[in-house]
Design a protein with these regions (language model features):
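Single conserved hydrophobic/aromatic residue that forms the stacking wall/gate
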Residues: 1-6, 10, 353
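Long, contiguous bundles of hydrophobic transmembrane helices that form the permeation core
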Residues: 3, 175-287, 291
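Hydrophobic mid-bilayer segments of alpha-helices in multi-pass membrane transport proteins
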Residues: 8-19, 24-43, 53-64, 232-244, ...
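Membrane-embedded alpha-helical segments and adjacent helix-loop junctions characteristic
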Residues: 16, 20-22, 32-41, 46-130, ...
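Alpha-helical transmembrane segments and, especially, the helix-loop junctions at the ends
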Residues: 63, 101-118, 132-197, 351-352
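Membrane-helix interface motif
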Residues: 151-162, 249-257, 316, 320-324
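Membrane-interfacial helical/loop segments at transmembrane boundaries in membrane proteins
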Residues: 161-162, 255-264, 329-335
Length: 354
């Protein structure tokens, strides 16, 4: 199985499964990962590795808490605050919009919470005669950048799980991702301020304006029904996130157990699962929210799609790598040792291609 020809077949099979899964949408990416894993196992005889159970359970716990916060009105409350901020400072919408969507995703751990703010951003920009593409473009990018910086996002949780055993803490990850993404978002916002012509100078916009093609109907975000419950849910969720960051940054805060004569510290995966499940339960109890309602929002199905995607794709990818580790090591070891920065560029380009 170490031959170059068979290795190329593996690569094509893995890429094909990913591409087809991406086209199917929803849980398609994950289930196609299962198909790819089946081919690797039953056709090519590769031994499956252990599925990423810890990563999946961490994501499920975080999504449970975020879903309960949404059911209690927490996300609606955050959107209402964002609307007030943007309408109060319309001339700075290009700078404020990405910061708002970044903060939303950073707190909730998912970019889906930023969708509700986008219509408000577009309306405020149009009313201020600012090209809507300027704040909208960078706002969407900012929400995705925040995924890599959020301590409870699927990406960060997955990375923390993959780096378990390498003496890398959650704080080590955040002290790189948070400054890097914030700086990138701010630079992108400044650049976006010069994208395209001003609306008063844009002939196409002026033409459509004269033809009355623009809808003057004002977008209004509905008031939160139970403001107290909404505020409590957001506060509980933020406190849970803060506890996770503290536990991840200071190992001495974690519980330790004597196992076979050795002191073993509780891993971050278990801590994240315990804290977030507890936060979800506290939100439901304190705000008197129906647990069924938590599964009917937009956050829960999106999060479960991420779990299935990681289940299939990560399992298939790990099996592929372990089955071809000798060949892969020989082919890239020399290059990585001489030019480690080139490996980072190669990974970046390969992800864009996929």
């Amino acid at each position: 199985y170490a031959s170059r020809g068979l290795g190329d077949v593996y690569k094509r099979q893995v890429l094909t499964a990913i591409i087809i899964g991406a086209r199917l949408g929803g849980i398609g990416l994950g289930v196609m990962g299962g198909v790819g894993l089946g081919i690797l196992t039953f056709v090519f005889g590769l031994q499956p590795t252990a599925p990423p159970i810890d990563v999946m359970l961490m994501i499920a716990a975080v999504i449970s808490a975020a879903s309960c916060m949404q059911a209690a009105g927490g996300l609606d409350y955050m959107v209402k605050l964002a609307e007030h901020l943007l309408r109060k400072n319309p001339s700075h919408v290009t700078l404020l919009s990405p910061l708002v969507t970044y903060l939303f995703t950073f707190i909730a751990g998912t970019g889906h919470v930023a969708y509700s703010v986008l219509p408000v951003i577009a309306e405020v920009a149009t009313e201020t005669k600012i090209r809507p593409e300027r704040p909208l473009g960078i706002a969407v990018i900012a929400s995705q950048q925040a995924i890599t910086a959020s301590p409870i996002s699927a990406a960060t949780v997955a990375l923390l799980g993959l780096l378990a055993g390498f003496d890398i803490t959650l704080f080590d990850i955040l002290k790189i991702t948070i400054p890097a993404t914030i700086i990138g978002v701010l630079v992108g916002a400044l650049f976006s301020m010069k994208v395209g012509k001003e609306l008063i100078e844009d002939p196409e916009y002026q033409k459509r304006l004269k033809e009355g093609l623009f809808n003057d109907k004002k977008i209004e975000i509905k008031d939160v029904k139970n403001k107290r419950s909404a505020m409590l849910s957001v506060l509980i969720f933020i406190l849970a996130t803060a506890f996770i960051v503290l536990f991840g940054s200071f190992e001495g805060m974690r519980p330790s157990f004597l196992i076979d004569g050795e002191i073993v510290t509780l891993g971050m995966s278990s801590i994240i699962e315990i804290v977030m499940l507890s936060a979800a339960a506290i939100i439901l109890i304190v705000t008197k929210t129906d647990g069924i309602k938590a599964t009917q929002g937009s956050v829960f199905p999106a999060g479960m799609q991420a779990v299935i995607a990681i289940f299939g794709i990560a399992w298939m990818g790990d099996t592929f790598l372990q089955g071809n580790m000798a060949q892969l090591t020989l082919s890239i070891e020399g290059i990585v040792r001489q030019m480690p920065w080139l490996f980072g560029i190669a990974l970046f380009l390969s992800l864009i291609h996929i």
